[in-house]
Swiss-Prot record:
Name the UniProt record assigns to this protein: Cytochrome c oxidase subunit 3
Family per record: Belongs to the cytochrome c oxidase subunit 3 family.
Gene Ontology molecular functions: cytochrome-c oxidase activity
Places the protein is found: Mitochondrion inner membrane
Assigned keywords, A-Z: Membrane, Mitochondrion, Mitochondrion inner membrane, Translocase, Transmembrane, Transmembrane helix
Subunit-structure text: Component of the cytochrome c oxidase (complex IV, CIV), a multisubunit enzyme composed of a catalytic core of 3 subunits and several supernumerary subunits. The complex exists as a monomer or a dimer and forms supercomplexes (SCs) in the inner mitochondrial membrane with ubiquinol-cytochrome c oxidoreductase (cytochrome b-c1 complex, complex III, CIII).
Gene it is expressed from: COX3
Domain of life of the source: Eukaryota
GO biological process, alphabetically ordered: mitochondrial electron transport, cytochrome c to oxygen
Coarse class of the protein's main subcellular location: mitochondrion
Length: 265
């Protein structure tokens, strides 16, 4: 006998993915520590843990998409959860990046004698902010405009236009990442070159990591839009991706001003 549901909430079925994700995280942590201390088998355990985590992410999100798209479990009330959950997640990422900005500002405003008492430190050849960084700025901001275009297209029910906009967004993101990689390759300093190199590569690298994650997020949204999964009433996943991408845009502006321009004077 099937009982009727008299509420708008989704009661999920028992799932093995939380425990499998926990085991993957445990293997990754232990393997990472073993690898850093040159223990035998550390690299193997680390690799297996990462593979297990990636597999768990794939099958777990597959189940969520199936429940929302095919089974219709994600009502308007259920959709509020992912929406509200995305906000503190993005705020936590802002705080993470704020720590890198703080480290850079502290080191530049009060340079120690170990780095010559000046900023940038003695012997560091900084990157010109008006070359690749300046070129990357309109590229990334244009990708943010394209994702907004995609959002308006979804709300208007124009599926093909939304796909085109997402293709433009992802293409610009890949160009940005390519230029960033070129800049790293040509950089005259490394992450081990004083506090300047450490804060530069940590801040820009962490932002670049977010760009890559956001690009993958938008690629999935583009595939789902092409398959007809996203509608003007139901596109929470895309909204989360768009918010995340705008967060990446704003952080880049702060990076350009504080790390590249002001930090390199």
């Amino acid at each position: 006998m099937i009982e009727s549901q008299r509420h708008s909430y989704h009661l999920v079925d028992p799932s093995p993915w939380p425990i499998s994700g926990s085991l993957g995280a445990l293997a990754t942590t232990v393997g990472g520590v073993m690898y850093m201390h040159s223990f035998q088998g550390g690299a193997t355990l680390l690799s297996l843990g990462l593979i297990f985590i990636l597999y768990t992410m794939f099958v777990w999100w597959r189940d969520v998409l199936r429940e929302s798209t095919l089974e219709g479990h994600h009502t308007k009330v259920v959709q509020l959860g992912p929406r509200y959950g995305s906000i503190p997640f993005i705020v936590s990422e802002v705080m993470f990046l704020f720590a890198f900005f703080w480290a850079s500002s502290h080191s530049s405003l009060a340079p120690t004698v170990e780095i010559g008492g000046i900023w940038p430190p003695l012997g560091i050849w900084v990157l010109d902010p008006w070359e690749i960084p300046f070129l990357n700025t309109p590229i990334l901001l244009s990708s943010g405009a394209a994702v907004t275009w995609a959002h308006h297209a979804i709300l208007a029910g124009k599926e093909k236009r939304a796909v085109y906009a997402l293709v433009a967004t992802v293409s610009l993101a890949l160009v940005f990442t390519g230029f960033q990689g070129m800049e790293y390759y040509q950089a005259p300093f490394t992450i081990s070159d004083s506090i300047y190199g450490s804060t530069f590569f940590l801040a820009t690298g962490f932002h670049g990591f977010h760009v890559i994650i956001g690009t993958l997020f938008l690629i999935i949204c583009g595939i789902r839009q092409y398959l007809g999964h996203l509608t003007k009433e139901h596109h929470v996943g895309f909204e989360a991706a768009a918010w995340y991408w705008h967060f990446v845009d704003v952080v880049w502006l702060f990076l350009f001003v504080s790390i590249y321009w002001w930090g390199g004077i």
